[in-house]
Amino acid sequence: MGNGIYKVIDKFHIAGNVDILITEGTNVDNNTKSILPEYVLKKEFKEVFRQYKNTFIICSSTDADRLESIYSANKESVRRPFIVDTYQKDILCLIDKYAENEKLLYHFNIDDICSYSPSVEKMDNMMRCHGFVMLLRCSEKFQSYLEKILPWCKPEETCLVYSQYHGYIDKREGNTAFNQKLYDFVEQFRERGCFVKEDLHTFGHASKQDLVRLCEQVNPKVIIPIHKDEKADFASILSDELRARVCEYEYSMDGVDISLDSL
């Protein structure tokens, strides 16, 4: 969470005028792992690209900063073919088009980005010869792509980088964020003997300090924390005054009863 959000709060006089603040709580109970900035992740992506000829990456399709880190890490190191699907390429085109004031931050060259087509044998041949960096999503479409690509990828030359919230693939008991389909999607790489790297995702989630500052500055009537472990105590990080405003299950406002489920 950058300092820009606080400038927006001041500019539009948001503080004290918000009924409900919905905020994440990913790092509420994170007392051990540090939050890595994107430039550190970028360096680690470079090391992965240098070590493995074929790199698959699962990440958010709309996280512009993460996409920039991955794209630039490849461009500044091994310069392998950068492979996406048409949806992801459209997202990158939108970022490139509308981030006119952020040209120093985003450096996507759309002409260098390849949209994968399983029917184009020339693309598969290029990927076999030069290796690749390919962005994935957990879907039937991408599963069909993998069934075509993985058989000719040597396991010792192939890596999957999981760059999303780890809770989605953490199979521990009581983890309500666990996603079986995503877990199976990731595990197929291990079953083939490929290396799976899961620790390149910490930025993009606000620290406890930022969450406290945000709640204090916005000063809403109700605070609803989402995207957190079930046992994480969001209210415990706030002052007594704000703690009383945290609603995780149900609340009433202006005669309306609202129940919160699976947030």
Language model feature labels by segment:
Residues 16, 49, 53, 96-99, ...:
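Generic secondary-structure transition motif, activating predominantly at the C-termini of alpha-helices
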Residues 1-65, 69-76, 81-83, 99-102:
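His/Asp/Glu-rich metal-coordinating catalytic cores
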Residues 72, 76-77, 111-263:
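C-terminal regulatory/interaction regions
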Residues 45, 49, 63, 77, ...:
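Positively charged, amphipathic N-terminal segments that serve as targeting/anchoring signals
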